[in-house]
Amino acid sequence: MAMKRKLNEHDVPEPESPQSPKRRASDASQSEPASPPAPTPAKEVVASFAELQLEPRLLRGIRDQKWGSPTAVQSKAIPLALQGRDILARSGTGTGKTGAYLLPILHNTLLRKGKTSLILVPTKELALQITKVAKALSAHCGQAVRIQNIAGKESEVVTKAKLADNPDIVIATPARASANINTGALAVTELAHLVVDEGDLVMGYGFKEDLDQIAQNIPKGVQMFLMSATLNTEVESLGSLLCNDPVVLKLDDLDKDSKRVKQYVIKCAEEEKFLLIYAMFKLGLIKGKTIVFVGDTDRSYRVKLFLEQFGIKSCVLNSELPLASRLHIVEEFNKNIYNILIASDETEILGSQKKADESRPKKKPKTDKEAKNDSGVSRGIDFLNVSCVLNFDFPATYKSYFHRIGRTARAGKSGTAISFIIPKDKYRKHKSTTFAGCENDEEVLKKVEKHQEAGQKLENYNFDMKRLEPFRYRFGDALRSVTRIAIREARIKEIRLELSKSQKLSRYFEENPEALAHLRHDQTLNHPARIQPHLKHVPDYLLPGGSRKPADVGFVGLNVPRVNKRQYVKGKGRKVVRRNGKVDPLKTFNARGKGKK
């Protein structure tokens, strides 16, 4: 079949000019729209986002976010994504995975209107966080990019209204996305991109059936992004289900230089955990913002109420609080309003880790899948500029340990991780402070040491417990005052406070956003009668030698001033008269008789 010649401006075929076979082959390849461009190898490191040839409006949004240069995962993934390749990426926390898929999706959305992108995440908190980042990056795009978040619990009427105008980007959990696809509210016929963020968590939280149903409904040719911190068997099976010949990026080695976490271990008794955390914060041994990880929510409030006795303020990230309150706590923590955040990873104990140690005590899982998945905080949520991660209760698995310490030393910064370990012979020796999850601390510690990366190791924290002996009598009274009843009252009090703020003041804060800064989440939850004000101050005699110099108060005389002397002599010997003018018999009684001495 003869090839058609190119027409000129007068619709007349131009004579075919002789050209090289290579040029002719390239022209033939351009005339076939079905064949994708040949993938070019991505650069190891890209100096700036401008080199990625992104839409100019997105580059302005990137500058507003003060993103410097692309991270390793962004340098590798974005050029491949712009070529239309499916991406299966393994990269640690804090390495810029969110930007690696958001930027190419936003770029393609601006070029091709009428297409939809679906982003699946394991939790509502992560969905809101991604929504915020996507809106910030597309701030200069006006109405060209419409973003909707349907991960939260809301009525079907509200969700249908959000999806009625076919938004460009939809963010949801797999359960919510599957439900809305079944009802027809979420149309996937024009789906261009599908993202599964934190793939290992999505599979661990039991969304396999929802993902299978979504995979059956999406059309062919959808570009896939699968992001995960680990590539286990479940994630690889998910990749084979959704992806078509994906590019596998394993970028842990490229990000090792940015992980500068100094890891320390302190082996102590159960009650000594409270003594150590009191001394560390009160004596200023921990600098900067700190996340304290504990076993469960009750444990969070026990630590908070204990620290309140000494005037140490902290806030609890409680899964029972309203979603808006939890996100506000994270935002305020990132703004350096709070320095100590107490969090729990209840999903670890609820069994989200499939290969967790069977000897661990198991709690009954909640019936509501969404409620269960909202409680974990060691993954997904971004905490900025965290200096220290304190494992008050050691995690249940070695994977959870690495996820926890991944909250610090992000974006090339250094950080510290300190872990309290309960030896076997000291477990259950102090019933009021014991925690069932600490029974196998030493076994989990061995697994952590076994899976350490090259150049990383756990060191013993050199802490002389004898120097803390003077503090024991102070911390003992404070610890005894934190009873189960006090913890229950504190939890109820905080939930009532946060519900009141969320319901009654939501409209007010929409109209007056500056007043939101006055909300504090580190309020005192202790009953006033339980707080002893003198415990807030550490006397000099309790401090180790040389920690604080005695104050110079000058010369203190022992003589009574003359004025006071005269007043004392003048008033001496006077009869004490009652208010009614009568003589006090107790002061004037004389056993020998009147007038006799």
UniProtKB/Swiss-Prot annotation:
Give compartment(s). Answer: Nucleus, Nucleolus
Q: Give residue ranges for domain Helicase ATP-binding.
A: 78-249
Record's keyword terms, sorted:
ATP-binding, Helicase, Hydrolase, Nucleotide-binding, Nucleus, Ribosome biogenesis, RNA-binding, rRNA processing
Q: Is Nucleus there in the keyword field?
A: yes
Where is the segment annotated Disordered? 1-43, 352-374
Protein's UniProt name: ATP-dependent RNA helicase DBP9
Q: What is its EC number?
A: 3.6.4.13
Q: Which CDD domains match?
A: DEADc_DDX56 (cd17961), SF2_C_DEAD (cd18787)
Q: Where does ATP bind?
A: S91, G92, T93, G94, T95, G96, K97, T98
**Compositionally biased region (Basic and acidic residues):** 1-13
Residue interval(s) of motif DEAD box: 197-200
Q: Which GO terms describe its cellular component?
A: nucleolus
What's noted about domains in the record?
The Q motif is unique to and characteristic of the DEAD box family of RNA helicases and controls ATP binding and hydrolysis.
> Tell me, what does this protein do in biology?
ATP-binding RNA helicase involved in the biogenesis of 60S ribosomal subunits and is required for the normal formation of 25S and 5.8S rRNAs.
Location of the motif Q motif: 47-75
Q: Which GO terms describe its molecular function?
A: ATP binding; ATP hydrolysis activity; DNA helicase activity; DNA/RNA helicase activity; RNA binding; RNA helicase activity
Provide one Gene Ontology biological process annotation.
maturation of LSU-rRNA from tricistronic rRNA transcript (SSU-rRNA, 5.8S rRNA, LSU-rRNA)
Sequence ranges assigned to domain Helicase C-terminal in this UniProt record: 260-469
